[in-house]
């Protein structure tokens, strides 16, 4: 009977391998079908579900690794829940929303000009050019790339994965705390509201939900003095319109729906900018040198996208970069302290 044990073990491994391949194939079919019928998984909760179920399928037959998926990926869930709850946190705390400070800061930085207004005056066309496809995709990568990086690291090196999770969760939670105590309106909202509309610092005045067309003097943001032929002569929120060239109207509708349901006054700091530079900095020494220009370009294109499409002020982006640098430095110091403490 003993000589048969290896054969039995080998047969069991073959069965588990077949089961794993079938599970992965089924996962691929489900994801492709849902993508084709309902659009890309821009909803972060759904994306996290896709990743976790895919990792579970790929872990069949590998001991306790399936359980590790649930244990290891739990830290991401509180971040998503906290972000959803942050919408009303500032109201509960009683903090007024900042409407004027970022506009004034950008004007001071750029000698009286507001970069969002300046860029839309000179670049916005009546119909989205090809490069708006690029910036729409770069903007949406914020909701996808960190989770994909985490999934790859989890499969390749769990120590690296743990280091990345510390950066992701740490940066996200600090930003969420700041959103609760310092709510701030983005440029697209400032273009829709006048000083009278936002007396007292409301978080969700009615002016935020109307078009910027016809708002006196361009609202708090200031009026566009010129525009390209045929383009609207007011500042618009245009981050998703690039997908119109690809007929991805479902994706645009999903993003618009998602934008309407999240915290609309979470502008300072820009988590888009902060997390982008944090991911780039984390990968900088972990990728071949030839990829580093792409990481740097990614950070800069994201910054341009956020300003041009009226998602963030420049000062929001600078503060996002600063927060990322502080979090990375604190984590590095903490890890160095742990290593020294372990050797002691």
Where are these regions (language model features)?
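N-terminal membrane topogenic signal
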Residues: 2-23
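Interfacial segments of alpha-helical transmembrane regions
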Residues: 71-77, 147-181, 188-205, 209-212, ...
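Membrane-interfacial catalytic/cofactor-binding modules of polytopic membrane enzymes
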Residues: 181-285
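Membrane-embedded catalytic cores of phosphoryl/pyrophosphoryl-handling enzymes
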Residues: 244-344
């Amino acid at each position: 009977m003993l000589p048969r044990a290896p054969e039995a073990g080998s047969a069991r491994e073959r069965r588990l391998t077949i089961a794993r391949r079938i599970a992965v194939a089924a996962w691929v079919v489900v994801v492709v079908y849902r993508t084709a019928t309902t659009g890309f998984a821009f909803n972060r909760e759904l994306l996290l579900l896709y990743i976790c179920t895919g990792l579970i399928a790929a872990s069949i037959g590998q001991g306790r690794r399936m359980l590790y998926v649930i244990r290891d990926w739990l830290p991401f869930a509180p971040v998503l829940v906290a972000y959803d709850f942050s919408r009303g946190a500032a109201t509960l705390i009683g903090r007024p929303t900042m409407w004027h400070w970022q506009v004034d800061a950008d004007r001071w930085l750029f000698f009286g000009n507001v970069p969002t207004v300046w860029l839309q005056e000179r670049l916005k066309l009546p119909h989205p050019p090809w490069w708006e496809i690029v910036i729409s995709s770069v903007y949406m990568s914020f909701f996808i790339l960190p989770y994909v990086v985490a999934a790859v690291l989890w499969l390749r090196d769990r120590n690296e994965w743990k280091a990345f999770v510390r950066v992701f969760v740490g940066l996200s939670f600090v930003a969420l705390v700041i959103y609760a105590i310092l709510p701030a309106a983005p440029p697209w909202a400032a273009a829709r509201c006048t000083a009278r509309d936002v007396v007292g610092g409301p978080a969700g005045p009615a002016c935020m939900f109307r078009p910027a067309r016809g708002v006196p003097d361009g609202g708090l943001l200031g009026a566009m003095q010129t525009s390209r032929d045929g383009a609207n002569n007011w500042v618009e929120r245009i981050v998703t319109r690039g997908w119109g060239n690809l007929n991805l109207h479902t994706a645009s509708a999903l993003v618009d729906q998602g934008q309407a349901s999240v915290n609309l006054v979470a502008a300072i700091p820009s988590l888009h900018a902060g997390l982008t530079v944090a991911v780039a900095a984390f990968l900088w020494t972990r990728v071949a040198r030839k990829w580093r220009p792409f990481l740097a370009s990614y950070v800069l294109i994201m910054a341009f996208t956020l300003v041009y499409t009226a998602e963030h002020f420049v000062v929001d982006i600078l503060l996002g970069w600063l927060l990322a640098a502080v979090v990375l430095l604190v984590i590095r110091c903490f890890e160095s302290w742990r290593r020294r403490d372990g050797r002691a």
